[in-house]
Regions:
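Canonical Rossmann dinucleotide-binding motif of NAD(H)/NADP(H)-dependent dehydrogenases/reductases
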Residues: 2-41
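Active-site loop of short-chain dehydrogenase/reductase
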Residues: 7, 64-66, 97-98, 144-153
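Rossmann-fold cofactor-recognition segment
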Residues: 61-79
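Conserved Rossmann-fold cofactor-binding substructure of NAD(P)-dependent oxidoreductases
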Residues: 76-93
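Conserved NAD(P)H cofactor-binding loop of Rossmann-fold oxidoreductase domains
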Residues: 104-110
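Substrate-binding pocket helix/loop in short-chain dehydrogenase/reductase
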Residues: 112-114, 118-123
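A short, exposed helix-loop element centered on a Lys and neighboring polar residues
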Residues: 137-138
Length: 153
């Protein structure tokens, strides 16, 4: 432990999802756990504040790091740049730096055939994926440049 001590990572989609068997089913939470084990402070984002709070509680308890949960939903019909700017502002206000941006979150209509996909479902996938990555990279760039940080898409 300690490779990332003093570093800050933003992880989109970092909430804690629980499967029916009680295990954790979120890729973002798995990523958050790996970074927490190495001592990084985390900013985790997602649509469900309760999942983010659950992740915060567990990660802080298990790994002695700081976690900032920020509810953020990048989708069609919202001011996405403002939502992302809010996440980045809170990260800087809380930790003073951003060393890693992990663009993990993306909503999709899993299990729906192409023939049955709606335009709304397609737009959700585009906004929560492609556009979110663009907005986060653009907003984080000045801070990542300063810390010689990294982006993981």
């Amino acid at each position: 432990m300690g490779f990332l001590k003093g570093k800050t990572a933003i992880i989109t989609g970092g909430g804690r999802a629980v499967l029916s068997d009680g295990s954790c089913g979120s890729i973002g939470y798995g990523i958050a756990t790996a970074y927490a084990k190495e001592g990084a402070n985390l900013v985790i984002t997602g649509r469900n504040l309760q999942k983010l709070e659950d992740a915060k509680e567990e990660l802080e308890r298990l790994y002695g790091i700081q976690v900032l949960p920020v509810q953020a939903d990048v989708n069609a019909g919202t001011d996405n740049e403002a939502a992302v700017a809010n996440v980045v502002k809170q990260a800087i206000d809380t930790f003073g730096r951003i060393d890693v941006l992990i663009n993990n979150a993306q909503a999709s209509a899993s299990g729906v055939s192409l023939a049955d996909h709606t335009t709304e479902q397609f737009n959700l996938a585009l906004y929560s994926g492609l556009y979110a990555v663009f907005y986060y990279m653009k907003a984080c760039y000045p801070y990542l440049k300063e810390t010689k940080g990294s982006v993981i898409n």
